[in-house]
Amino acid sequence: MILDRIMKTKYLQEPSGPVNILAVADEEVPKFHEKHDKYKKDEYEGIDLILSCGDLSYHYLNYIADVAHCNVYNVFGNHDELFPEGEPLGCIPIDGKFIVVKNIRILGLGGSMKYRECKKHQYKEEEMVKRVKKLRKSIDKAGGFDILVTHAPAFGINDGTDLCHTGFKVFKELIDEYSPKYFIHGHVHQNYGKFPKITQYKNTTIINAYRYHKFEYVFDEPEGL
């Protein structure tokens, strides 16, 4: 897809400096949590944006947002239920949404492949396709997106062989069509098998956020704008 540069500049008025991002998913990390003596506040030093790929508790997300002094943008995992006390303070749900934060266009799609009836945040492939279709207008209006945040991986790219951990084909189609800088997911725990932390697929860096991963988002220089 050829990006509409005029529409893109409407959303990204001018390039910003690098954005330091913390991505988290699936399993709580002792050094980030108040219950552990090894917790160090400097773990959050310089973090500008936090992305949660799901399956983390209310209190963990609430604590991270509070100590880091920045919002946590989260999608749901297949083990998540609706938070009993409402959305954690400092957390902004982006599941099924397209948003722009710090000049970064972010698309959020939580949940896993449907493997059990009567469970929330599980979808058949065709159901996920419908979710994506609802967001197409917003995506195209913005000239694409920069980061895809999901719980499940993309089909055929570091996904599992069982139904639960099979990735979505539509995620791969989104990457092929829009070439985002990053695709960040969780769900396939690295202790389940030899799943790499970082993979390069075409122009997209894929990050398995299991537990956590820190990285720096650097803006491209504008081309002839």
PLM feature spans:
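Binuclear metal-dependent phosphoesterase catalytic core
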Residues: 2-18, 98-102, 123, 174-178, ...
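Active-site regions of enzymes building and remodeling cell-envelope glycoconjugates
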Residues: 48, 69-74, 87-97, 201-209, ...
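Active-site neighborhood of phospho(di)ester-bond hydrolases with catalytic His/Asp-centered motifs
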Residues: 23-25, 49-55, 73-78, 94, ...
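Short glycine/proline-enriched coil/turn segments at helix->beta-strand junctions
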Residues: 18, 46-48, 68-71, 88-90, ...
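N-terminal active-site segment of His-dependent metallophosphoesterases
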Residues: 1-64, 136-144
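Metal-dependent catalytic neighborhoods of phosphoester/phosphodiester hydrolases
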Residues: 33-38, 56-70, 81-91, 159-161, ...
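A short, gly/pro- and small-residue-rich
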Residues: 68-79, 168-171
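Conserved catalytic scaffold of divalent metal-dependent phosphoesterases
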Residues: 24-32, 76-166, 211
